[in-house]
């Protein structure tokens, strides 16, 4: 079910179990990138691992927020993904207005605040840090871009816009950008330099 209101079929070849998206995930079909070999077999690119309904009230940035910021509007349909996306966009917009992250202009237009995504990211980070702190009984040490992080890769947290790695030390932890290369080292010591934030 696609954003144009039609159902599309694509031959993706053989997918391993990890590459099959879960029901409710939002994906895009993508070919090879600029630095990759051209291929006739499209690949799935995960846009969000969170279903639309949960995104409407999520305390953090979502695929819906990106659609709102870029002023994307689905084609109007009565059923299917486009109808669900339209309904979710309206619900998310109302939620953002309630949080004063979208402002109403005098002519009735709804305009996202310039710092909307940053404010959502900060709210998400604070909530995730508090949750992990309670669970691990440890204090969160925020990562600073360009600094070195060492510790044990504990687990990953899936958010609507990606994953965050929990790097644990004795009585502290850091929420760091997640990379697929970390997965084989779960439960093991890791080290790295913090790059740009998500």
Question: Where do the language-model regions lie?
Answer:
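Extended intrinsically disordered terminal tails
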Residues: 1-198
């Amino acid at each position: 079910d696609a954003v144009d209101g039609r159902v599309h079929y694509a031959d993706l070849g053989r997918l391993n179990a990890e590459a099959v998206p879960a029901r409710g995930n939002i994906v895009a079909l993508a070919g090879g990138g600029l630095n990759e070999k051209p291929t006739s077999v499209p690949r799935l690119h995960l846009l969000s691992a969170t279903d639309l309904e949960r995104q409407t009230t999520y305390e953090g940035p979502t695929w819906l927020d990106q659609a709102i910021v870029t002023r994307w509007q689905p084609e109007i349909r009565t059923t299917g993904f486009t109808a669900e996306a339209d309904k979710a966009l309206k619900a998310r917009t109302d939620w953002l207005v309630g949080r004063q992250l979208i402002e109403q202009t005098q002519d009735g237009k709804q305009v996202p605040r310039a710092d909307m995504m940053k404010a959502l990211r900060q709210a998400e980070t604070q909530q995730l840090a508090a949750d992990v702190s309670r669970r691990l009984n440890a204090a969160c040490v925020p990562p600073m871009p360009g600094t070195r992080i060492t510790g044990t890769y504990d687990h990953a947290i899936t958010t609507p816009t990606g994953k965050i790695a929990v790097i644990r030390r004795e009585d502290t932890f850091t929420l760091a950008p997640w990379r697929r290369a970390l997965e084989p080292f779960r439960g093991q010591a890791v080290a790295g330099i913090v790059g740009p934030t998500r």
